[in-house]
Amino acid sequence: MKKSFSILLLAASFFYQGQTTKEEILSNLNQTGGVYYAYPTPTKKLTAVPSGYQSFYISHYGRHGSRWLINDKDFSGVMDILRKANEYNALTENGKSALKRLENIWKIAEGHNGDLTELGGLQHKQISQRMFKNNPQAFGNNAVVTAKSTVVPRCIISMAYFTNELTANNPKLNISVESSDKYMKYLNHHTKESIDFKSQDNFWQEEKRKLKQDALRSDRFIKNLFNNEDYVYKNVNPEKVVESFYWIASDMQNLETDISFYDLFTKDELFNIYQAINYQFYVNDAASPLSKGLVKDNAIPLVKNILEEAEDYIKNNKSGASLRFGHDGNIAPLLAFMRVEGMDKEEINPREVYKVWNTFQAAPMAANLQMIFYKNKKNDVLVKFLLNENEVSVPLETKSFPYYQWKDVKAYLEKITKSN
């Protein structure tokens, strides 16, 4: 018992452990953007590789980098509301300021429906740089690197930035780059049952609606923008205006602009909206017990692909990497299914979810899971897990965290894919 306890202690480098507080979230307002949180550059030092081992293979899944809001109307809709109000002298000075900022952003935003931003490309370039720097042995002249993405342009371009940087570091690398419907069955897999769960009218949908509705009700916010209550009553959907500004405010960090809209919100307002959106994503795409495993099981084909490709590299004595590029709705189920540290926490109370699970930790822009494989001269294979380039644990014993025996990880992944 004592030995087992000590092994578990050795395995605990809990980057995502413990409960998150409201104060921690609000210490960086960008975190309230959830999936719009720009990739946080890692600062923690990585654990030294065990003596006699060197990296030879990397299995990766990454979300596309920072992007624009999905639809032009996400900007123009609320801008048009403020423009009309301005024509009727129904805007406060703060409202006029917000409109001016919107119009300045619109000059560059128009037409960029969900496109990758410059920052999004830079994120993947820098992640690639660090991957190469930390694992040069995996990217030698004989390395075989495969890169596959979903068919969405922002994923394809993210992949291009990533692989171009690898080639810049070693022009002799053999890299195959593909984007095809052929690979969507594991890069972006969603069962009919999980889709039905998200769309059907059930108890959690009503709970979600009320939580969001409560968060978006803000007389203070509306009065800060509009000076005519009668005009607002007849012409403005207050909740729509508040939500629109929340998304716009959240996305500014992805544009590398000095324009900000956070001043329109109180910290409590930002937190309440984030809490509602975070709960929705948690149930739709993560470890919520409400889905009874339907959502996280979407990752099964991806985990099987991870197993197959890892075994191919090991058995055939190859070096290189398997790079995969997709979306937030793919990496979050993967983390929950594999029970990556902190990503499998379960909570049914909507107002308590943020304490155990947060979108900005699981699926920020350019979020990525890396499995780094190492071997020694005896071909003993170790693997460690990096979430957003930070060392994390999985529910297996090890005497040398963050390094696990591949045979143990393989058995674990085979077990969970077969039992679900």
Residue positions per predicted region:
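Bacterial Sec-dependent N-terminal signal peptides
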Residues: 1-22
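Signature for phosphate-centric chemistry
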Residues: 19-144, 150-322, 326-420
